[in-house]
């Protein structure tokens, strides 16, 4: 049976997305999170800029890949999230993500996952405690190709945001080695 949702979408129409994560908190040792569908820490910083509704590119037709950071390690992966380290008002947050089958989601119950290579992602964020935050990350997927010139896929992003009362501004850049991306995965 289909579950009726807002705007006439049903659970079988493809008009909605469900994401589930399992988190194991270990106190001062941090958190381990098992990710399914956009759950990784890397995928969470694909677009960190302030927004009133959603990302500025939401609902548009485009070929931009700036928001693809974390997309290869977001489903079927495992995160380790270090507890925030505090230095007065400042804090430092670090994460590491491992995906044994980067670019593919986990296998269905009783199934076998596709044969993609592994990927890793790392993120860091420094929060000043006074509205300024600086962060970034790197994501790498090992090559699945033995073709001459094939190399690993690498994505990186960095951002700065500032909030003071109702005012929020930000700047973010993203890099992807597009020349090699076709040879990877």
Q: What is each of the regions a protein language model found here?
A:
Residues 1-185:
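Outer-membrane beta-barrel proteins
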